[in-house]
Amino acid sequence: MSKDLEVAGRYANALFQVAQDKDLVDVFSEELTELKAALNANKDFVKLLENPTFTTEQKKNLASAVFEKINPTLRDFIYLLIDRSREDYLSVIADVYQKRVNDLNGVADADVYSVVPLSEQELTALSRVFAAKMNKTKLNIQNHIDKSLLGGVKVVIGTRIYDDSLKTKLKDMERQIKA
């Protein structure tokens, strides 16, 4: 694990603990998702927030103006990050926090690769089958198009890969023939 991810993980875990204590886990999850989307959409704001020539107070005033509608506890957390010069971790913290929420709710993220876009019915069926395999209640599936698979699907959930693509089957046959 990289040092940055480790640091972000500590902050995310602390925020998650506070959210659980205050029964705000879902509120923080929604607000962090919106906050991350806003940061990704506005790179100039991120540059200002991470600018070392700005004082801590100037950064807090900027954050206060932009994040005025978020939960006060979450806003205080952002101020804490600014105080400790960790504002550049905010996006990663949001990701780690969401992973903790997903773990709590029995949800996992899955990337499904296919040659053509899968229908809602196919995605639902894949979600049901692989959620059961992973002991999860639900999978958030992201469908990616990969023409090199030739056919079939490849499902990636965390570090696990389930590859039922024609490309892999052909490679397996090639290895068997050469052996």
Curated annotation (Swiss-Prot):
- Please report the record's description of how this protein sits within the membrane: Peripheral membrane protein
Top-rank taxon of the source lineage equals: Bacteria
Location in the cell reads: Cell membrane
Say if the entry is tagged with keyword Hydrolase. no
* Matches recorded under InterPro entries: ATP_synth_OSCP/delta_N_sf, ATPase_OSCP/dsu
MF (Gene Ontology): proton-transporting ATP synthase activity, rotational mechanism
Q: What is its main location?
A: membrane
Query: What's the subunit arrangement here?
Result: F-type ATPases have 2 components, F(1) - the catalytic core - and F(0) - the membrane proton channel. F(1) has five subunits: alpha(3), beta(3), gamma(1), delta(1), epsilon(1). F(0) has three main subunits: a(1), b(2) and c(10-14). The alpha and beta chains form an alternating ring which encloses part of the gamma chain. F(1) is attached to F(0) by a central stalk formed by the gamma and epsilon chains, while a peripheral stalk is formed by the delta and b chains.
Provide the family line: Belongs to the ATPase delta chain family.
Q: What is this protein called in UniProt?
A: ATP synthase subunit delta
Instruction: Look up and give the organism this protein is from.
Output: Listeria monocytogenes serotype 4a (strain HCC23)
